[in-house]
Amino acid sequence: MMQDLRLILIVVGAIAIIALLLHGLWTSRKERSSLFRDRPAKRSKKEREQSPIDELDEGVGEVRVRSAHPEDEPSFGHFDAAREEPVVAPKPAPAAEPAPRAVQPAAHQTPPPLSQRPDYDDILLDNYAQEEDDEPQQPAPRREPRVDDLPPVAPAAEPAFHAEPAHQPQPEVKPAVAHEPQPAPAAIKPAKLKETVLVLHVTAHQGGVIGGEILLQSVLQAGFQFGEMGIFHRHISPAGSGPVLFSLANMVKPGSFDPEMMSDFSTPGVSMFMMVPSYGDANQNFKLMLQSAQRIADDVGGVVLDDERRMMTPQKLETYKARLREVLENNA
């Protein structure tokens, strides 16, 4: 079965190949025959287009010169002149009939240049000559003059003088009134800092708390005394006498302490604050408050933070000192 199928496929393939070859031969032969059939017409047209101009002139000459008629045919380039100024031929006519109008003989006339010669084909010239023989007195159709035949046009003469435009009165322009610049409003100066509050925080490590007993012992050793508003104050004298330099309060509201309940008390931290200006030297008072905060932090195992509750840095200390100087200068 497979052998028969293979044989059938081979036969069908061979037939298809032979059919393709025959179709290709037939198509090429058809194209070749059409090519040879169109070639003579193209060749004759090409020869007619490439024919020299001298041959056209000779054909026109043979048509114009005739022995049967004494007159010459009018030139194509001068129909207008022949129609306006007819000239009688110099040779007498053999017959008694009146002499037809004719222009000057073409033999004594200079042939027009190549640019003025009519671009007619040979066949058209022959037909035109035959019509002239049949009707010698009928004038040829008027031909439109070419650009080369027209006489040059002289340019128009420019006027000897130019007319001056009439003087128009200009409107009077009033000078603009110069506006005096108004003085700019004085810049609003910021209010001078007359007083400020310097704050330090002492907090436990990692969110822890500070016990009440150890906190009370450290605060008393730093020279604080329990006093007004239920908070501790540092006076100019460690014994608790004299003006208050700075104070210590609880970070948790209401910020007060109860000395009798310190054994059961705990807090995340305490806050120390100093009013500026204060009694005595403000710089020395701030230095004393910073030393007290560091001592309490060491006793309770905490850290010292600034007024934004960040770690105290040397740059922040310079900021505190600058605020102190500004307030002191403004109050001087």
Swiss-Prot record:
Pfam families: ZipA_C
Isomerase keyword on record: no
Lipid bilayer topology: Single-pass type I membrane protein
Gene Ontology cellular-component annotations: cell division site; plasma membrane
Assembly mode: Interacts with FtsZ via their C-terminal domains.
Biological role stated in the UniProt entry: Essential cell division protein that stabilizes the FtsZ protofilaments by cross-linking them and that serves as a cytoplasmic membrane anchor for the Z ring. Also required for the recruitment to the septal ring of downstream cell division proteins.
Identification of the protein by name: Cell division protein ZipA
Biological source species: Serratia proteamaculans (strain 568)
Upper taxonomic lineage: Bacteria, Pseudomonadati, Pseudomonadota, Gammaproteobacteria, Enterobacterales
UniProt gene name: zipA
